[in-house]
Amino acid sequence: MAIAGGIFCYDWICARHDFCWQLSLLAADVFATVIVFLFSVIFGNASVYDPYWSVQPPVILLVALARRGGSPFAWILFAAVLFWGIRLTANWRYNFKSFEYQDWRYVMLKEKTGVFYPLINFLGIHLFPTLVVYLCVLPATTVILEGAAFKPICALFLLLAFAAPTFQGIADIQMHRFRKRGSGGFCRDGLWKRSRHPNYACEILMWWSVGLASFFALDMRLLLLAGAAANTALFLFVSVPLADKRQSRKPGFDEYKKQTRML
């Protein structure tokens, strides 16, 4: 429903107003986010938003391709983002057993913010991530809508854009197996032996890869990297500290932190 609402909003704005496509897309994205937020309120569960994070980018690119058409380069960019979205959605589905489950971070925010939680829920859990992901997918959308030409250096970043979700998937499987064993402590299997947050590292890599592939195809416009930079800041200053703080409750965390890189 949110996706359909977003597409309707985009078409409605384009038909009635002469805004630039970037602004029209942003308005439609925010409108869809409001729909998701309303459902999260109805179900009393902010985790309703989580799959929107992974569905939003491929849908935006697919709509752009349907309206504008695309070169092989544009379709490969879309395929990389679609692969990323499928991996992230599959991991969410694996963890989300029912509406009784809610991400621990949202539960923590609700406990800490009290009566202000509805505002924090909308601005912090729903709107802010939507804006970050919008900025992340904007470079690839620009490639499609402006018909940017492929350049040889783009091949490197396209390869990395496929590698990032591949390694994220590997990290997911390793973590799921560790949790099934129920041995407690810290996961030190595979990628987790080298990094405390390999999934976050690959998420950062993913959007720098998409951003840089688009950056070089579009004559090195620096603003195209704003999304990758914002996404990196989100993980470095919010996601990683929150996860480490939660892990710090376990015995031996200080030693584990010394032995294992953050990313």
What annotation goes with each model-predicted range?
Residues S40-Y49:
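Membrane-helix interface "capping/anchor" motifs
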Residues R93-Q102:
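Juxtamembrane interfacial secondary-structure elements that flank transmembrane helices
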Residues I3-F8, I13-H17, D29, T33, ...:
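Hydrophobic transmembrane alpha-helices
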Residues V48-V59, Y101-G124, G185-W192, M262:
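Juxtamembrane helix-capping/reentrant segments at transmembrane boundaries
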Residues F19-W21:
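Interfacial loop-to-helix junctions that mark the boundaries of transmembrane helices
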Residues V36-F37:
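N-terminal non-catalytic cap/leader segment that marks the start of a structured domain
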